[in-house]
Amino acid sequence: MRPILLSGHERALTQVKYNGDGDIIFSVSKDHVDADSHNGERIGTYHGHQGALWTVDVNPDSTLLATGGADNTLRLWEVQTGKLLHTWEFNTSIKRCEFSPDGRQLLGVTEKRSGHLSTIVVYEINPDPEAKQSDEQVLRIVCDESKATVAGFSYLAKYIISGHEDGSVTQWDGKTGELLSSNYDVHEPDMQGYALATKHVRFDANRVQLVDVEDLTVLKSYVTDTPLNSAAITPVKDYVILGGGQAAMDVTTTSARQGKFEARFYHKIFMEEIGRVRGHFGPLNYVAVHPQGTGYCSGGEDGYVRVHHFDKPYFDFMYEVEREAAREQANL
């Protein structure tokens, strides 16, 4: 599984994202936002933010791109031309942005700082790049108990699921913003993030939890011996990919092997580690999986994006119980 190395950033990566077709990878870092094809060709750079960028997302049609950063703005771009379409301004940084599954809404999470509480905001989005976008917030959720570090839409935007600094996970009504339920026993304080599929993956220092979005119960737990920064659920195969490594402040005194700067693959059902992929020279800050499950990419503290395409053994690997189930299914 030889990777393609993308080196368009000079500072640490903060998020990487595939578009819906899996042929474009968007990456943001503490310098700017890039777009690259899945085979490593540079497509373009989006200029306009001042300072570090924390988050990026692309709508389902791959026509609109959203970014948020430390300049206290959430921005909307036209993917094809790189044209800045709209800017929403806030009092604090934008830590996470995400389009709804239909692309008609855009969610943003603001930082808690300087007397301003963390908020989750939602805007209606007109998919036409030539149309004027609204500044009116259709939802505004103020997180007065514990700041939201991450949030996203569930399937069909039925819920908004947020992770908080105190380790709790909260479920909000996707239409009204009403608080529906919270689970305070999911993680230790300072939850880092999530990955969304039918269920959520949430992680803290060295543990990943698979959480059901309907009732916020913890379904599975994946424990490692290294700090974690990101996790992703793979389609096609029942795997979870974990990324992390020794804290960035310590990497200058640590070799790549000792720092455990690697992507780790766990079986989603059996919770066992089944493989590792090395290569980064610093912690993995974000991992993202190809929408068709044919590969994954990782963004690191070293400023590189590594794009991996899965080989045949990845798809052939099965536990014996999985092989038996497959044989029984074939005989029906």
Swiss-Prot record:
Return the Pfam families for the record.
Answer: EIF3I (PF24805)
| GO molecular function terms attached to this record | RNA binding; translation initiation factor activity
Query: Under the cellular component aspect of Gene Ontology, which terms does the record hold?
Result: eukaryotic 43S preinitiation complex; eukaryotic 48S preinitiation complex; eukaryotic translation initiation factor 3 complex, eIF3e; eukaryotic translation initiation factor 3 complex, eIF3m; nuclear periphery
SMART domains membership? WD40 (SM00320)
UniProt key word Hydrolase: no
In the record for this protein, the WD repeats are positioned at 8-47, 48-87, 144-182, 279-318
The entry's localization annotation reads: Cytoplasm
| Keywords per UniProt | Cytoplasm, Initiation factor, Protein biosynthesis, Repeat, WD repeat
Quaternary form? Component of the eukaryotic translation initiation factor 3 (eIF-3) complex.
Instruction: Tell me which PANTHER family the record gives.
Output: EUKARYOTIC TRANSLATION INITIATION FACTOR 3 SUBUNIT I
Member of which family?
Belongs to the eIF-3 subunit I family.
Function according to Swiss-Prot or TrEMBL: Component of the eukaryotic translation initiation factor 3 (eIF-3) complex, which is involved in protein synthesis of a specialized repertoire of mRNAs and, together with other initiation factors, stimulates binding of mRNA and methionyl-tRNAi to the 40S ribosome. The eIF-3 complex specifically targets and initiates translation of a subset of mRNAs involved in cell proliferation.
Q: What name is this protein filed under?
A: Eukaryotic translation initiation factor 3 subunit I
Instruction: Specify the species.
Output: Phaeosphaeria nodorum (strain SN15 / ATCC MYA-4574 / FGSC 10173)
